[in-house]
Amino acid sequence: GENQCVGFVASLIDDSFAPGGERLLEPVAELLGELICAPITERGRFVPAYFDSEKQNLLDAIRSLINDKRDYADSRLLREMCAGEAYGVPRLGTEETAERLQPKRLYAWYQELISTARLELFYSGSAPQRRVEQALLAALSSLPRDQVREIALHQPHPARAEVLRVEEALDVTQGKLGMGFACGSDDYAAMMLGNTLFGGSSNS
């Protein structure tokens, strides 16, 4: 939807498979909490060398999107259909916005993010619920939670009076056609099934 989601994921083997039955949940949760709550910084900003490396990775990912013509066509469709709306912003952003990123400004934004964003925790494994709760609560105990904002609800934009057609010529062997419909239907499940039937998934 209109909201940006940021995720942190840790994978670990079950204690029963660890040598000597070592308990792994707690140290892994602690590491995850440290990465989220206390990332490495330098003079109130992300470390420039690490920042520059990740910035280049982001730019490379944005530029390589055109190599997957289906994903590129989907991205162009949303940018044109939802121009001026948050939903029209590409998932990775644009080259222009990525180029403007700076370590100090990004760190300030990150601090705002972890202070105001809603937090959801998911665990899949065999550890008892109480143990998982204790491990995660301890790991995230320093996470500021007193300024959490409610998620804003957005109404879909109304359908255009006239069909918008956009063409882009590329050196490809197979063209891609994307069609977007602003329907605003409350019957979301049926709409998604219809999208799948018309070729909206790998199972179509």
Locations of the language-model features?
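Acidic/histidine-enriched alpha-helical segments
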Residues: A38-I62, E150-P158
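Short, conserved charged micro-motifs
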Residues: F17-L25, Q129-Q134, D187-A190
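A generic local secondary-structure boundary/capping motif
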Residues: L65-I66, A108-E112, R165-A169
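M16 family metallopeptidases and their MPP-like homologs
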Residues: G1-A38, N57, A61, R70-E96, ...
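His/Glu-based metal-binding/catalytic segments typifying zinc-dependent metallopeptidases
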Residues: R118, D146-S204
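A common structural junction motif
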Residues: E30-E42, A138-Q147
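Short amphipathic beta-strand starts and helix->beta connectors
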Residues: G1, A98-W109, E162-V163
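Non-catalytic, conformational "gating/processing" segments within enzyme and secreted inhibitor domains
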Residues: P103-A139
